Amino acid sequence: MKVFLVTCLGFAVFSSSVCVNINILQQIGYIKQQVRQLSYYSQSSSSYIVVKLLPNIQPTDNSCEFKSVTQYNKTLSNLLLPIAENINNIASPSSGSRRHKRFAGIAIGIAALGVATAAQVTAAVSLVQAQTNARAIAAMKNSIQATNRAVFEVKEGTQRLAIAVQAIQDHINTIMNTQLNNMSCQILDNQLATSLGLYLTELTTVFQPQLINPALSPISIQALRSLLGSMTPAVVQATLSTSISAAEILSAGLMEGQIVSVLLDEMQMIVKINIPTIVTQSNALVIDFYSISSFINNQESIIQLPDRILEIGNEQWSYPAKNCKLTRHHIFCQYNEAERLSLESKLCLAGNISACVFSPIAGSYMRRFVALDGTIVANCRSLTCLCKSPSYPIYQPDHHAVTTIDLTACQTLSLDGLDFSIVSLSNITYAENLTISLSQTINTQPIDISTELSKVNASLQNAVKYIKESNHQLQSVNVNSKIGAIIVAALVLSILSIIISLLFCCWAYVATKEIRRINFKTNHINTISSSVDDLIRY
């Protein structure tokens, strides 16, 4: 008895609901690549981050004057001044100018936007709406500036307004402040200049799009990651509550920032962070597959199945995920993009090879091998598979669609001149002999489809010709059938007439015989009566 492993992410309950048989699919060139958890997200709330761009430096015993800080402050002012002016033009349009627009009671400086799309105007509305919180946070600028903590919560009463962050302060606190009294002023100034220069380079990279228009160019969280530096995990943890790791959320780009205020005197920047609401569907898995060519019916073919499958319990759907954000372990979507699979496709996913459909390929570059967990799955009938250690050619039999090469078969493998080191064993316990009918192979290439359509048209024309001939024959058969029906009806009527005549004759014969018998009895009685009368007279 053959025993094989069915790697299945769900459990079959109904006959039309089956689980994915990854081992069988691998043997026909359909290889599982990645499994991700499906989550849905929507932008629902906001948080604020105060970025403190000028660090606090403790006074030294030598009363050093750091020229690098003065130069850094001057350069930073030149960088932030256009941003501050642009925000002020959008948030506070001139009362004497008529070129401003109101959206739901909010005044927006249209001239500052330039040529803006609907999405950009929406961003400007968001910027204006955030000014109330920005002013409340700016009112506490002195306390923010006085602290030398890298992460500092800005609170008004018991309500947290924002998180004050200074990435460069973390470097100053951990490295520079411990050496202030042990080095000369020149050495400290050079070290500080190096740190501030690197940080300024990152700021220039992050805010370069903002120099054009902050309302039209939101800051991605990847750029904020450079801005926040080592404080990024702490900020994400403080602003977003979810079981998903901060790295997954940041790499997906679900959080975006927008500059809503710049305080030039204190070198502080208030950034509004759009925080998503994330809901994970616990039993929904999105499986990515990688298709390679296979040797089917003496030709190179490829299986016709979608590259991405959604499996919820024991049901499968095609899942393009065109508008989703993918990370290593999660896929974030705003809505469900599932598409229905045919019953044949579901049966094929379950390992029923007779339900699979393949498409022949010729004259085109195809994926003919893939690395899988330290092994190689290759179509060794369409490319040269040569094992170098030990040295021997790898042959793929006709009844195998692909060949799985693991450490037991080869240590160093060459595929058309490319060398690979095999480091793992395959977890497939056996290779099934495949039997695939010719009807399971269809053409999907445009040229092949045109050729097949020409054949179909020729067949249809021949079919029309045969149909006309058969119609003519049927018409002849119909005429003869009418004559035959009349003859049969006449014969039936004649037979019925004969039968009725015979029955009438039999009835007449029996009736005549009965009448004669009655007459005979009557005459006999009359004779006896006459004899009795004669006897009485006598």
UniProtKB/Swiss-Prot annotation:
Residues 128-156, 452-477 form a coiled coil. The inactive precursor F0 is glycosylated and proteolytically cleaved into F1 and F2 to be functionally active. The cleavage is mediated by cellular proteases including host FURIN during the transport and maturation of the polypeptide. It is a single-pass type I membrane protein; Single-pass membrane protein. The record marks R102, F103 as: Cleavage. Its main location: virion. Keywords: Cleavage on pair of basic residues, Coiled coil, Disulfide bond, Fusion of virus membrane with host cell membrane, Fusion of virus membrane with host membrane, Glycoprotein, Host cell membrane, Host membrane, Membrane, Signal, Transmembrane, Transmembrane helix, Viral envelope protein, Viral penetration into host cytoplasm, Virion, Virus entry into host cell. It is found in: Virion membrane; Host cell membrane. The keyword Mitochondrion does not apply. Disulfide bonds join C324-C333, C348-C356, C380-C385, C387-C410. Residues 508-538 are cytoplasmic. Residues 20-486 are extracellular. Residues 103-127 are annotated as: Fusion peptide. The 2 coiled coil regions form a stable six-helix bundle. Homotrimer; disulfide-linked F1-F2. Interacts with host LAMP1; LAMP2 and LAMP3; these interactions promote the cleavage of the viral fusion protein F. Belongs to the paramyxoviruses fusion glycoprotein family. This is Fusion glycoprotein F0. It comes from Mumps virus genotype B (strain Miyahara vaccine). The lineage of its organism: Viruses, Riboviria, Orthornavirae, Negarnaviricota, Haploviricotina. The gene is F.
